């Protein structure tokens, strides 16, 4: 499925938050995933960036090694170092001191859906500040076309023809 329309649709749903979201996606990117699952993934990572960032978010999508790499980067404080290894674990919340909302399931759902579709998710701190969530999903495989051997009329037998018994 093409991801660019869903990417723009997901970003548009967060326009009312006042966040400054820029999107840069290569044209004609396709991934092997259920559209509703991709919507849930994009919603969760964008919600995370808006909740923990400072209002400036960059969304990117590009092809890489038979996959599509989707990045969502905020310019907030980034993840605490101890949080990075468990960012996608269930019921894990990054910052309870800031009065953060949520159940700690958003990124766990992202990881589960991404893995289900043959991809992976990771969280990093960007060297220039802020956190980055990266989702990698496989591109569709081209259809398999097996070359079948040619069959000629001399290769087939007519089932209606009587069996020749003259040699017997």
Swiss-Prot record:
Its EC number is 2.7.13.3. PROSITE patterns: HIS_KIN (PS50109). Residues 137-168 are annotated as: Disordered. CDD domains: HATPase. Pfam families: HATPase_c. GO terms for biological process: negative regulation of phosphorelay signal transduction system. It comes from the Bacteria. The keyword Nucleotide-binding applies. Signal peptide: none annotated. Interacts with HK2. HK1 and HK2 are merged into a single protein with a distinct N-terminal sequence in strain CDC 1551 / Oshkosh. Member of the three-protein two-component system HK1/HK2/TcrA. Kinase that binds ATP and catalyzes the transfer of a phosphoryl group from ATP to HK2. This is Sensor histidine kinase component HK1. It comes from Mycobacterium tuberculosis (strain ATCC 25618 / H37Rv).
């Amino acid at each position: 499925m093409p991801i660019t329309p869903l990417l723009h649709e997901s970003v548009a749903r967060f326009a009312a938050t006042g966040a400054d979201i820029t999107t840069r996606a290569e044209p004609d990117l396709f991934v092997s995933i259920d559209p509703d699952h991709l919507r849930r993934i994009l919603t969760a990572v964008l919600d995370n960036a808006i909740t923990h960032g400072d209002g400036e978010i960059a969304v990117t999508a590009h092809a890489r090694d038979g996959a599509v790499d989707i990045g969502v980067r905020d310019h907030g404080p980034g993840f605490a170092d101890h949080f990075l290894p468990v960012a996608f674990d269930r019921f894990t919340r990054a910052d309870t001191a800031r009065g953060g909302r949520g159940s700690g399931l958003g990124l766990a759902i992202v990881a589960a859906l991404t893995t289900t579709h043959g991809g992976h998710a990771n969280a990093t701190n960007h060297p220039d500040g802020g956190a980055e969530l990266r989702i990698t999903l496989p591109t569709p495989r081209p259809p398999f076309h097996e070359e079948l051997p040619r069959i000629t009329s001399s290769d087939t037998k007519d089932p209606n023809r009587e069996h020749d018994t003259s040699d017997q």
